[in-house]
């Protein structure tokens, strides 16, 4: 079982969404990014998740020196299909695994999400991208 698979149901049970996990060298830093669908993550939310995960990781005998829990930030990564569905209408930046017309990086407005592809309005042109070809995707913050 992966660490993501271990933590996701626990975090979901607390009313949060597990966005991403970063690990430095084994046994060092474990960074967990969580979000809420109905609002911004607060410091109290991060503390609650951190306390709960600390106990879970001890029980599961997961080796780490330091646990950090934080929000994914304004430019949060989009990883799952549900992330894309949630942010239809928002500006995003994507990087492709395999170039499309010689280009791997695109910026545009997310207009539609299908079962295995998404539509992005890039400079007035609708372009379709397969979800499996996405290397990275992030929201572009509204400032």
Curated annotation (Swiss-Prot):
InterPro entries per record: Ribosome_maturation_RimP, RimP_C, RimP_C_sf, RimP_N, RimP_N_sf
Chief localisation class: cytoplasm
Pfam families linked: DUF150_C, RimP_N
Subcellular location: Cytoplasm
The keyword Cytoplasm belongs to this UniProt entry's keyword annotation: yes
Gene Ontology cellular component terms for the protein in this record: cytosol
Biological process (GO), any one: translation
Keyword annotations from UniProtKB, A to Z: Cytoplasm, Ribosome biogenesis
UniProt-listed HAMAP family: RimP (MF_01077)
PANTHER family in the record: RIBOSOME MATURATION FACTOR RIMP
Role played: Required for maturation of 30S ribosomal subunits.
The family this protein is said to belong to: Belongs to the RimP family.
Protein name in the entry: Ribosome maturation factor RimP
Source organism of the structure: Nitrosomonas eutropha (strain DSM 101675 / C91 / Nm57)
